[in-house]
Amino acid sequence: ASDVYKRQAYARQLPRDDCRTLERFTRGFNYPEESDIKDAGDLPKLGVKTFFCSNVCAMYDRRTYEELGGFVESTLFNEDMIYAGHLVQAGYAIAYAADAKVVHSHNYGCLAQFHRNFDLGVSQAQHPEIFDAYPSEGEGIRMVKKSASYVCKIHKPWLLVTLFFQSGFKYVGYFLGKRYKSLPDGVIRWCTSNKTWWEYHLSLIHI
């Protein structure tokens, strides 16, 4: 893509010193060493990964940001990727700048992964104009396979058990989040990592 179409950029994330093995691999999976430019032409190959972007370290062209209406006014999670989806659909490109680096990683347990992926599923369900045609399940399966191959390669096969449980919690959270409209309010409050957001929005629903 020509420079004139690059209207959003995000940096490479490097793991912290205390980062666990699987999370360290995930950083490398999502933030490789090579820079890239992504636009609508990449959708057949990359699918939902075309819209991948992180506000942990990102920059935006202000005029395009205002043209597209900026971030959605109210979302539980994933505002950066939702904006990126609208950007790509508008004919612009996203730059992944691997030379720009920031140290950022998590050591989430299974339950934290569940809550986080529930919120991810909700955000995608609320924006079918972006995510219905490009579901995340395929990319998730690809990451699990790559992670399994990696832990075997480094001779730590016992981490396959951790990977199995983490992946299961992630998927169940995501699955429920995508179907949040069918869940009782109490279940939603338990599943989410942002109870305050739901207290406000559930009250609006019931007015």
Predicted regions and their residues:
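Conserved donor NDP-sugar-binding/catalytic core segment of glycosyltransferases
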Residues: 2-24
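Short, well-ordered alpha-helical scaffold segment located
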Residues: 59, 63-67, 101
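Acidic donor-binding loop at a coil-to-helix junction in glycosyltransferase catalytic cores
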Residues: 76-83
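A recurrent flexible, glycine/aromatic-enriched loop bordering the glycosyltransferase active site
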Residues: 40-60, 75-76
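Active-site-adjacent helix/loop segment of glycosyltransferases
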Residues: 94, 101-173
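Short, flexible, basic/aromatic active-site loop/helix in glycosyltransferases
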Residues: 12, 28-50
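Membrane-interface aromatic/basic loop that binds lipid-linked glycans or pyrophosphate carriers
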Residues: 161-204
